[in-house]
């Protein structure tokens, strides 16, 4: 089974961790519970919930990459992975609800969409993220995938000034060629926002840019 090829054990800061694909409904629900704890309770996101689980229509069509603490059995990190087969079954990519993906249509057959990435607050020492990325690379190799897409979160709590400044900061070096560029369905009106604030790049987005 695919999870056996991805599974990898590691000891980080005396924590015995393993990355694998969820193989039971209980493991998937543990990941959904972690997502709810972080996105809803910690970050204040307004998301639908069933019994304290973050669940939407995409979940049943995704693979769920998880990191577990082998000493207590808890899921302490997760990623949701959607490939072209799952996207067809659910009616499209999650990202397509936010962006026009037509310019990258030609690469979607070999693409994995990443979503719902999170790490338990007691395990944010970098080790869990490293294991998730190790598992992700292995998954892409086994599935013969070459591209990653997904939505990265940037706070809009200040009305969008931080987001606008971050965009201006990153576009100088990281803006993709036009033929690979996607466009938001509801764009931020940059000309109405401050674009010169000193801002930090969110850790997850910084990691993607280094990949």
Where do the PLM segments sit?
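Acyl-donor binding region in acyl/amide transferases
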Residues: 84-211
């Amino acid at each position: 089974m695919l999870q056996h090829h991805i599974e990898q054990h590691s000891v980080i800061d005396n924590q015995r961790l393993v990355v694998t694909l969820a193989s039971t409904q209980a493991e998937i629900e543990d990941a959904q519970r972690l997502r709810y704890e972080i996105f809803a309770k910690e970050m204040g996101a307004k998301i639908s919930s069933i019994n304290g689980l973050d669940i939407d229509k995409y979940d049943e069509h995704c693979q769920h990459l998880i990191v577990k603490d082998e000493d207590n059995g808890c899921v302490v990190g997760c990623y949701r992975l959607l490939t072209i087969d799952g996207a067809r079954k659910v009616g499209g990519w999650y990202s397509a609800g936010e962006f026009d993906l037509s310019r990258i249509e030609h690469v979607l057959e070999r693409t994995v969409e990443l979503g719902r990435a999170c790490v338990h607050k007691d395990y944010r020492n970098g080790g869990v993220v490293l294991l998730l990325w190790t598992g992700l690379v292995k998954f892409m190799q086994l599935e013969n995938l070459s591209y990653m897409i997904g939505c990265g979160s940037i706070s809009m709590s200040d009305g969008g000034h931080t987001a606008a400044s971050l965009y201006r900061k990153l576009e100088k070096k990281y803006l993709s060629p036009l033929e690979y560029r996607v466009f938001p369905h509801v764009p931020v009106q940059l000309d109405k926002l401050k674009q010169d604030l000193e801002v930090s790049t969110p850790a997850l987005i910084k990691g993607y840019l280094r990949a």
